[in-house]
Swiss-Prot record:
Signal peptide: none annotated. This is Aspartyl/glutamyl-tRNA(Asn/Gln) amidotransferase subunit C. GO terms for biological process: glutaminyl-tRNAGln biosynthesis via transamidation; regulation of translational fidelity; translation. It comes from Rhodopseudomonas palustris (strain BisB18). Keywords: ATP-binding, Ligase, Nucleotide-binding, Protein biosynthesis. Heterotrimer of A, B and C subunits. It is an enzyme of class 6 (ligase). Belongs to the GatC family. Allows the formation of correctly charged Asn-tRNA(Asn) or Gln-tRNA(Gln) through the transamidation of misacylated Asp-tRNA(Asn) or Glu-tRNA(Gln) in organisms which lack either or both of asparaginyl-tRNA or glutaminyl-tRNA synthetases. The reaction takes place in the presence of glutamine and ATP through an activated phospho-Asp-tRNA(Asn) or phospho-Glu-tRNA(Gln). Its EC number is 6.3.5.-. InterPro entries: Asp/Glu-ADT_sf_sub_c, GatC. One of its GO terms (molecular function) is asparaginyl-tRNA synthase (glutamine-hydrolyzing) activity.
Length: 95
């Protein structure tokens, strides 16, 4: 699979990226190189290779799942222009 100049312009348009005509050949080469690399990865024989999530065997540290209120409600709402009972007061937006 290869990317042509029209495809580069379409991708740029969909991504809302401004691309000049001078940049199209460079981007075309970059995209084609990426696709070639992905095709190369597809040719790698991975039969018998166990899936892995990390190169080093380690366990995530776990904490006790304890429910609390954070004990900082006053600090959380301190910068709000209007509060009531630790809740933010906002202007009514739906009538």
């Amino acid at each position: 699979m290869s990317v042509d100049a029209t495809t580069v312009r379409r991708i740029a348009h969909l991504a809302r990226i401004a691309v000049t005509d001078a940049e199209v050949p460079h981007l075309q080469g970059e995209l084609n190189a990426m696709l070639a690399f992905v095709e190369q990865l597809g040719e790698v024989d991975v039969d018998g290779v166990e899936p892995m999530t990390s190169v080093t065997p380690m366990q995530m540290k776990k904490r006790v799942d304890a429910v609390n209120d954070g004990e900082i409600a006053d600090q959380v709402v301190a910068n709000a222009p209007a509060t009531e009972d630790h809740f933010f007061l906002v202007p009514k937006v739906v009538e």
